[in-house]
A protein has these predicted regions:
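Glycine-rich loop(s) and the adjacent beta-strand/alpha-helix scaffold that form part
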Residues: 22-25, 36-41, 46, 234, ...
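N-terminal glycine-rich phosphate/pyrophosphate-binding loop and immediately adjacent elements
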Residues: 1-124, 243, 262-264, 307, ...
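A conserved FAD-binding loop/helix module that cradles the flavin
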Residues: 559-577
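Conserved redox-cofactor binding core of oxidoreductases
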Residues: 102-245, 518
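A glycine-rich dinucleotide-binding beta-alpha-beta segment and adjacent secondary-structure elements
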Residues: 188, 206-210, 246-249, 415, ...
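Glycine- and acidic
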Residues: 104-107, 155-161, 209-215, 295, ...
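FAD cofactor-binding and catalytic pocket of flavoenzymes
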Residues: 67-74, 86, 111-112, 269-270, ...
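Short hydrophobic beta-strand that contains or immediately precedes a catalytic carboxylate
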Residues: 32-33, 239-240, 551-552
Length: 586
């Protein structure tokens, strides 16, 4: 029986969406499976209480932490994945990040590819995701352009496709004053559809509801808007929403994946549900009926570092008793997501800026200024905006609202990131107990989508969906001393510049502290490498153990770096797509 599709892609986030966009435009027959619907376009997209206190766009799935306590992940299951609610900061990893780096807490290992291998794809990713940035009056250097702002910026073969966003008054004042102290600052590269020269013609309105919010006006460059909606109408593309992949099925020898098992939820009949693969018996019935089976020549798992590992572990069979691609026992291990926290810098000066995420510094990225501590610290950037409702969840119970409101008008929120290091004991495991039944979103039609169809995007009725067994996320923080030094360094800079009378960690008032629940930067659970004994994937992101299985999301990361991972995920998906088209899908 011929395969139904050339490639089946599981997940529509930064990796899956980009891979689908690239392969579909090359004319390949693509099946795209997304476990969630299209995110509803509604007023609540920009409602701070709904987004941050009610967790309207997070799954109701319950995971476990290392001790078995309940964990409520800030995970979004929609077309576009986590990019629907990300902050759109589009950083290239530093060239040094691809090599071995000694940290105070240990080694950040080398990748099997170099920055030079990735650079052309970074350039293409910046074009696809409409990235604004500025290298300044940088001289030409080998390979292209350097940066006159950021000494750590690697070479670019081309300048940014769109100009950087300008500062508003408060952020301009702070930037001027920290520069007087000798701090190098740079414009943050942002994936936003902003027209600074003609704001009236701009999709992006520089609102104060960007970081962590869905974009009501679709001005944020995400994998849904920039990728999936550009290809879903093509005759060679089948997009199925509300369709959760539960298992990958292999041939009798276990050398290749033959099919994906899918549970559809919601109205409508899923396309191809009666088909069965050649080398497997019918799967067991589920609570929603028999799972659908889809065959393809190649399979790309792009469900995010947690769920990609979960799918491989859940696909264990006689030939792969510990999970697919897990001969090395590395699937699920080396989970990373950054040591990161938000810091409120409070001063007597008022902050009336709407959007503050316009500049940052990497002066502490590669080294601490203290010569007795010759280790990297990390990156500093502002948060896009801050609302006092974000503090209401855990503020002291008698704190008056006007106090929180006053803090909002005198605070600038900063986001500090230090690399966390791969640790095999920081891992995802799947306990094959009775699945935990949860309430999750139901909006949109099941099955193939015609041109322009995004389902009933204003419906928001919860339905019952099952988590795939019990997911356990075991994590012990590392590199903490470097992170604490980074916070101290930045607070000291702000105080010397006159822009921080005091400071408080935002998690002191945030309903959910960033550790563990905040899995937006998840990576590393299916690391790539040349040695099958110590890695899951080869340098092209193909599983060492199976000939036609790829994992194309942040799971493949060997190290986390200290920058937002989105652009690297996108660029790597383009790199893998080129490999597939040149070498495998002829």
């Amino acid at each position: 029986m011929p395969d139904q599709f050339d490639v089946a892609i599981i997940g529509t986030g930064a990796g899956g969406g980009t891979l689908a966009w690239h392969l579909a435009r090359a004319g390949k027959r693509i099946l795209i499976l997304e476990r969630g619907p299209f995110l509803p376009r509604e007023k609540l997209n920009w409602d701070t209480s709904a987004v941050f206190l009610d967790n309207r766009y997070h799954t109701k799935e319950i995971w476990q932490d290392r001790e078995g306590k309940e964990l409520h992940p800030q995970q979004s299951y929609f077309v576009g994945g986590q990019t629907k609610v990300y902050g759109a900061a589009m950083f290239r990893m530093r060239a040094e990040d691809f090599g071995v780096i000694q940290h105070q807490a240990g080694i950040s290992p080398a990748w099997p590819i170099s920055y030079a291998d990735m650079e052309p794809y970074y350039t293409r990713a910046e074009e696809l995701f409409h990235v604004h940035g500025d290298l300044g009056a940088a001289p030409s250097i080998p390979g292209g352009f350097g940066s006159s702002f950021d000494p750590t910026e690697p070479f670019h073969s081309k300048r940014y496709p769109y100009p950087a966003l300008a500062n508003e008054p408060r952020m301009q004042s702070i930037e001027n004053d920290v520069r007087k102290l000798g701090v190098n600052t740079f414009p943050i590269p942002l994936g936003l559809k902003r027209n600074e020269e003609d704001p009236l013609a701009s999709k992006c309105v520089r609102c104060d509801t960007c970081d962590g919010y869905p974009c009501l006006v679709h001005a944020k460059s995400d994998a849904d808007i920039n990728c999936i909606r550009q290809i879903m109408h093509l005759p060679n593309v089948t997009l199925m929403t509300n369709s959760r992949a539960t298992r990958l099925l292999t041939n009798s020898t276990g050398t290749a994946v033959t099919a994906v098992e899918v549970i559809h939820s919601g109205p409508g009949k899923p396309y191809g549900s009666a088909l069965q693969p050649a080398d497997t018996s019918a799967p067991p019935a589920s609570s929603n009926g028999n799972p659908a089976i889809y065959t393809a020549g190649f399979f790309a798992v792009c469900a995010g570092a947690v769920n990609s590992a979960v799918l491989l572990l859940a696909s264990a069979n006689e030939k792969h008793p510990t999970g697919l691609a897990n001969r090395s026992d590395q699937v699920g291990r080396n989970f990373m997501y950054h040591q990161a926290d938000a810091l409120l810098a409070i001063s007597t000066s008022r902050n009336e800026d709407s959007y503050t995420k316009t500049w940052g510094t990497n002066d502490f990225y590669l080294k601490d200024p203290d010569p007795s501590y010759p280790f990297p610290l990390g990156q500093v950037q502002p948060v896009g905006s801050f609302h006092f409702e974000m503090m209401k969840g855990d503020a002291p119970p008698l704190t008056p609202g006007f106090v929180l409101e006053a803090m909002k008008h005198h605070a600038v929120p900063w986001w500090l990131t230090t690399e966390d290091l791969p640790d095999p004991d920081n891992r995802i495991t799947l306990h094959n107990t009775t699945p935990l039944w949860v309430e999750s979103w139901q909006s949109g039609l099941v099955g193939a989508h015609p041109a322009g169809d995004t389902g009933r995007t204003n419906q928001s009725e919860p339905v019952t969906d099952a988590a795939p067994g019990r997911i356990q996320l075991s994590y012990t923080p590392n590199n903490i001393e470097s992170f604490n030094r980074l916070k101290d360094r930045w607070v000291d800079v702000l105080k010397k510049a006159g822009h921080a009378t005091t400071s408080v960690p935002l998690h002191a008032y945030f309903k959910k502290r960033i550790p563990l629940e905040g899995v937006g930067h998840q990576n590393g659970t299916c690391r790539m490498g040349a040695d099958p004994a110590t890695s899951v994937l080869d340098p092209h992101c193909k599983a060492h153990d199976l000939d036609n299985l790829y994992v194309v999301d942040a799971s493949c990361f060997v190290s986390a770096s200290a920058v937002n991972p989105s652009l690297t995920i996108i660029a790597n998906a383009m790199r893998v797509a080129d490999h597939l088209l040149a070498d495998r899908l002829k």
